[in-house]
Amino acid sequence: MKICGITDVETAKSACEYGADALGFVFAESKREITPKRAEEIIQELPANVLKIGVFVNESVEVIQKIADECGLTHVQLHGDEDNYQIRRLNIPSIKSLGVTSESDMKNAQGYEADYILFDSPKEKFHGGNGKTFSWELLRDMPKELRKKMILAGGLNALNIEEAIRTVRPYMVDVSSGVETEGKKDVEKIKQFIIKAKECSK
């Protein structure tokens, strides 16, 4: 599971201790935006086996690659209108994020060459992290090959994660606002989310 929108080392370390597989750092306009320098400082304190994912929105490949190299990112998440041309130019594993409004979004996802596909709620002011779910039923009949690399996001929290995993059976789940209190990451909510997610993934 991925905890996204990390901005401080204490929360990052706690998430890793509780069993997070990946942490997300947002390098785009967001309530959780972080500078490359701050992200690098946090990443240096993290276990080697935890994935460090940088989130970008319509950024140039050159800037993405520069930040990835400087910070020590293991993956980049493309949360804007990026296409396969940009994906191919990256020399780091990629995640393409798509907003879901209908079954056709799932079909369109199969055309992307990213290593993983992240299904999220439709974008609003910010791309992602809006705390809203979408109809998981739209993803129920996903092809097996797509499901193997599918990440589920969008309004997940400790109360709905069990239903989400049972319905969609994703490769990974991604949470941000669902583990926050008054806009700040809440380590107790992170702990409860991870416990619930691991329970229903057994």
Swiss-Prot record:
It catalyses: N-(5-phospho-beta-D-ribosyl)anthranilate = 1-(2-carboxyphenylamino)-1-deoxy-D-ribulose 5-phosphate. InterPro entries: Aldolase_TIM, PRAI_dom, RibuloseP-bd_barrel, TrpF_fam. One of its GO terms (biological process) is L-tryptophan biosynthetic process. It holds the Pfam family PRAI. It is an enzyme of class 5 (isomerase). Keywords: Amino-acid biosynthesis, Aromatic amino acid biosynthesis, Isomerase, Tryptophan biosynthesis. Belongs to the TrpF family. Its EC number is 5.3.1.24. This is N-(5'-phosphoribosyl)anthranilate isomerase. One of its GO terms (molecular function) is phosphoribosylanthranilate isomerase activity. The keyword DNA-binding does not apply. The keyword Isomerase applies. It comes from Bacillus cereus (strain ATCC 14579 / DSM 31 / CCUG 7414 / JCM 2152 / NBRC 15305 / NCIMB 9373 / NCTC 2599 / NRRL B-3711).
